Amino acid sequence: MDSNTVSSFQVDCFLWHVRKRFADQELGDAPFLDRLRRDQKSLRGRGSTLGLDIETATRAGKQIVERILEEEPDEALEMTIASVPAPRYLTDMTLEEMSRDWFMLMPKQKVAGSLCIRMDQAIMDKNITLKANLSVISDRLETLILLRAFTEEGTIVGEISPLPSLPGHTDEDVKNAIGVLIGGLEWNDNTIRVSETLQRFAWRSSNENGRPPLPPKQKRKMARTIESEV
């Protein structure tokens, strides 16, 4: 196993522990708590894949971080922070909408790269809105946190989420996954609307890169883009 993979996991475990202590003092905002919850799932998946114990990795990560901080002057730390672009966290969904459990009458699941696509094929003739929470850097998609499909009644009927055991995805991965979700939902004559946030950062207009957003074999009846509700 690559030593960098192990040490990266150890540092991530310790930094998650620090963030958890911060949240336990009720100091974190909603985006912070949401990332904390999702990163916990990711760490569990990575730990299982690597065969590493999280508690042991956390202790090792603490030693690595302490050693770095001892060697790092404050001036260098300030310069590093200033030179790194800060991501923006954009939200279509509330924390309740993101954490709500949902069930499928006719479940369908597909894995595309490091993204898992789930939808309920029992849904027919509905107006459906795609909403997402994501982070962007320099006006480009950095990470899709979660995408969900909602009916007008607020029922969740579809979802795209990163696989905890396979971190990392590109904006093209997200775009392709959205195409699969839309194609599956449109198959039952549902009408799909896309939030302004998704339209801008993950589901850009057709012909932008010389091809339509949906694969040729999928239906093309995208409804008008709606403005973000948040």
Curated annotation (Swiss-Prot):
Chain residue ranges for the region called PABPN1-binding: 223-230
Example GO BP: symbiont-mediated suppression of host mRNA processing
PTM summary: Upon interferon induction, ISGylated via host HERC5; this results in the impairment of NS1 interaction with RNA targets due to its inability to form homodimers and to interact with host EIF2AK2/PKR.
Region (RNA-binding and homodimerization): 1-73
MF terms (GO), sorted A to Z: protein serine/threonine kinase inhibitor activity; RNA binding
Region called Disordered, residue ranges: 205-230
Entry keyword set: Eukaryotic host gene expression shutoff by virus, Host cytoplasm, Host gene expression shutoff by virus, Host mRNA suppression by virus, Host nucleus, Host-virus interaction, Inhibition of host innate immune response by virus, Inhibition of host interferon signaling pathway by virus, Inhibition of host PKR by virus, Inhibition of host pre-mRNA processing by virus, Inhibition of host RIG-I by virus, Inhibition of host RLR pathway by virus, Interferon antiviral system evasion, RNA-binding, Ubl conjugation, Viral immunoevasion
InterPro entries xrefs: NS1, NS1A, NS1A_effect_dom-like_sf, uS15_NS1_RNA-bd_sf
Motif (Nuclear localization signal): 34-38
Domain of life: Viruses
Ranges spanned by the short sequence motif Nuclear export signal, renumbered to the chain: 137-146
Keyword flag RNA-binding: yes
Principal location class: host cell
Gene Ontology cellular-component terms listed: host cell cytoplasm; host cell nucleus
Free-text domain note: The dsRNA-binding region is required for suppression of RNA silencing.
Assembly with partners or alone: Homodimer. Interacts with host TRIM25 (via coiled coil); this interaction specifically inhibits TRIM25 multimerization and TRIM25-mediated RIGI CARD ubiquitination. Interacts with human EIF2AK2/PKR, CPSF4, IVNS1ABP and PABPN1.
Function noted in UniProt: Inhibits post-transcriptional processing of cellular pre-mRNA, by binding and inhibiting two cellular proteins that are required for the 3'-end processing of cellular pre-mRNAs: the 30 kDa cleavage and polyadenylation specificity factor/CPSF4 and the poly(A)-binding protein 2/PABPN1. In turn, unprocessed 3' end pre-mRNAs accumulate in the host nucleus and are no longer exported to the cytoplasm. Cellular protein synthesis is thereby shut off very early after virus infection.
Family per record: Belongs to the influenza A viruses NS1 family.
HAMAP family associated with the record: INFV_NS1
Protein known as: Non-structural protein 1
